């Protein structure tokens, strides 16, 4: 066994939804660095996500709205038209509803609740469903993004009036992602399609770190006493995309600084 080749993605066609986002862009970069042909799928090609004078870390950009089945279908069809198949799908994109004042359970209406659940869970479901035809022949790897709040409740005491206060629909949706990952792993195993999840802990975007009190309280909830840096999620994604995880399916890798372990 040549262990150096276990993480080699040469010849793999990798699609990352939400690929211009804070965590998604790191997924794109590491998959490209390890030899993958990377397709960035997002609502817009955000130039400010890439450092000055740095070449884009992807081979193709496709506009994709993960709230729309037709948009996802068109995205995957465009990738297949150019490359012939899809080997890896990273379902990173999601959207929320009900943050801030509308986050309290007793005041949330049905429409807002359902929209938030769809933004967390429906996005992963649609991505998995629509990519299957492109992976059936040769197998593949699907990686879903869960959340620590799909495993444990947020400690609402630390949020106060912070606009990032977690609504109930987000955690409910992400808990669903963990379960549908296990279900899909079983359902798609006959095609050689592996389905796993990664669960980030606190990885706040630096643009949202103005509240010093809240940031410190959030960091103190981890065993390591700090936030995660965006690149620290990338290794788990690389593992699951590569042959290094060839005997892994239905798994959920938690990268949370110990948040959910105590």
What kind of feature is each model-predicted range?
Residues 222-233, 244:
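A conserved structural motif in NAD(P)-dependent oxidoreductases
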Residues 95-96, 110, 143-176, 181-190, ...:
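Catalytic loop of short-chain dehydrogenase/reductase
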């Amino acid at each position: 066994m040549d262990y150096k080749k276990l993480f080699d993605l040469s010849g793999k066609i990798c699609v990352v939804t939400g690929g211009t986002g804070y965590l998604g862009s790191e997924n794109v970069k590491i998959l490209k660095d390890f030899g993958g042909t990377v397709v960035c799928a997002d609502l817009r090609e955000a130039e400010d996500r890439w450092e000055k004078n740095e070449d884009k870390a992807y081979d193709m950009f496709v506009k994709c709205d993960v709230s729309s089945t037709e948009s996802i279908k068109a995205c995957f069809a465009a990738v297949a038209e150019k490359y012939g198949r899809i080997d890896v799908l990273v379902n990173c994109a999601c959207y929320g509803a009900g943050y801030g004042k509308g986050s309290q359970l007793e005041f949330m209406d049905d429409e807002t609740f359902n929209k938030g659940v769809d933004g967390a869970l429906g996005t992963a479901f649609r991505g998995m469903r629509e990519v299957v035809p492109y992976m059936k022949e040769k197998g593949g790897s699907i990686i879903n993004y869960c959340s620590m709040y799909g495993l444990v409740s947020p400690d609402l005491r630390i949020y106060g009036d912070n606009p990032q206060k977690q609504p109930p629909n987000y955690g409910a949706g992400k808990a669903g992602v963990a379960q549908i990952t296990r279900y899909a792993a079983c359902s798609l195993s006959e095609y050689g399609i592996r389905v796993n999840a990664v669960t980030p802990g606190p990885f706040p975007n630096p643009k949202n770190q103005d509240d010093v009190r809240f940031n410190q309280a959030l960091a103190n909830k981890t065993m390591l006493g700090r936030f995660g840096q965006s690149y620290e999620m990338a290794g788990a994604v690389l593992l699951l995309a590569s042959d290094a995880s060839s005997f892994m399916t239905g798994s959920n890798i938690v990268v949370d600084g110990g948040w959910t372990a105590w």
